[in-house]
């Protein structure tokens, strides 16, 4: 099986149908996705999204998408999504979520950094961007730790529970990642 990533402490494997229950459980944890506009997704919506990622893996490395399950000592602790936003400019987007009990140990930073490196080395990527709720200070700090640059602020372009929020855009270019 390709697209497996290992770090000193973590194993990242491409998501498969057996992982959908974990993704659903993770996505329903309020603290993990409270800044997202679709934080109360139904099982059917989560399953549809997971199947989209599984199908889009076939288009890698020039286009497509992949979702990794992050494991620590064979326990699922989070997930990372990477997908092509524009195959002409080789612009990709990254997203992530981790179980709250694993916050503060550097696992998210370690995994995101490994995915960025893997993407630049194995996929046709020029730029990787992360778009996050401007109130999500922990995610903003993570982006900075892994070498991403804050590009700007999109004003009131996302809605969470009926309230508009701003979005920060962070990115890293292939020439910057080392």
Question: For each predicted feature, which ranges?
Answer:
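Conserved GNAT-fold acetyl-CoA-binding loop/helix
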Residues: 31-55
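Soluble sensory domains of the PAS superfamily and closely related sensory modules
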Residues: 58-62
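Acyl-donor (CoA/ACP) binding surface of acyl/acetyltransferases
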Residues: 1-34, 64-178
């Amino acid at each position: 099986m390709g697209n497996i990533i290992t770090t000193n402490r973590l194993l990242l494997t491409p998501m498969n149908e057996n992982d959908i229950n974990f993704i659903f459980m993770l996505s329903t944890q309020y603290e993990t996705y409270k800044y997202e506009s679709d934080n109360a997704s139904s099982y059917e919506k989560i399953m549809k999204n997971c199947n989209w990622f599984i199908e889009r893996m076939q288009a890698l490395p020039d286009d497509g998408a992949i979702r990794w399950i992050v494991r620590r000592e064979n326990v699922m602790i989070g997930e990372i999504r990477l997908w092509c936003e524009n195959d002409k400019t080789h612009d990709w987007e990254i997203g992530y979520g981790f179980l709250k009990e694993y916050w503060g140990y550097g696992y998210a930073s370690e995994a995101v950094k490994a995915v960025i490196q893997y993407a630049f080395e194995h996929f046709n990527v020029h730029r990787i961007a992360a778009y996050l709720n401007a109130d999500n200070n922990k995610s903003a700090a993570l982006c900075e730790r892994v070498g991403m640059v804050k590009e700007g602020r999109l004003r009131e372009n996302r809605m969470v529970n009926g309230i508009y929020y701003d979005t920060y855009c962070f990115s890293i270019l292939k020439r910057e990642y080392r």
